[in-house]
Amino acid sequence: MTCGIRYGQVQKIAFTRIGNLFSDASNPITELASWSAFLAAEDSTKIVVTPYVEAPTMEGGDEKTFGGGNATLDGIIMVLGSQPIRMSFALRNYPQTIISALKILMKIKDLGVFLFNDNGGIICLQEGDTYQPIPIRALFVGDLILSGRIQPDRNTMKFSFKSNYSDKLVVVKPNFSPVNDLANIDVHIGDGSFALAFNPSYDI
């Protein structure tokens, strides 16, 4: 019997373009040096990591149906597939320079994510001996919501996964702590590499 998989709470998100991947042979996903190379990049291979995200929620995933009643045989509905998943997060007390940078990612085509959980794992897609980001669509980063003295100020971030996104989903346990050992996006805003790497001209 196979042991159950604990996906855990998503605590940070790494954004990159689809096509950037880790390979067991050349740049293992479990090694900090492999990630450091992607984080240091100044071109379309760059990866950037958010600070902590909170209140992760997922909606959707229900079946798409047609018919029922007199429209279909025996009144039984037809299942046409599944709805996409919409995931949302609260970005609490973020400097708005980071929010502004995340909004630039809304313009980038073919974007994907690696999700870092509370158990030190990396949630991603596996194809043979390669590990790839999960493709996302419809990234949205909202403006600041001031909450006064009642609760922390926050921005909202949302994106969608396509149907069947989780068919090849795995949790990888690396030899380092993704949430603690990988530099956040603000470092790459400050050194100028974010602006170089996430220039929409790469995607035209």
Predicted regions and their residues:
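Solvent-exposed edge beta-strands and adjacent loop segments
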Residues: 1-88, 132-154
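A structural detector for beta-sheet-dominated domains
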Residues: 16, 40-41, 50-52, 90-92, ...
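Short linear motifs in intrinsically disordered/low-complexity regions
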Residues: 25-28, 44, 63, 75, ...
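Generic "edge-of-domain/loop-turn" microfeature
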Residues: 54, 94-96, 120, 141, ...
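Residue-level detector of short, conserved catalytic/binding motifs and their immediate flanks
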Residues: 87, 111, 157
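Short, acidic/charged, Gly/Pro-enriched secondary-structure junctions
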Residues: 90-131
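Mixed-charge, glycine-accented linear interaction segment located at domain edges/termini
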Residues: 133-200
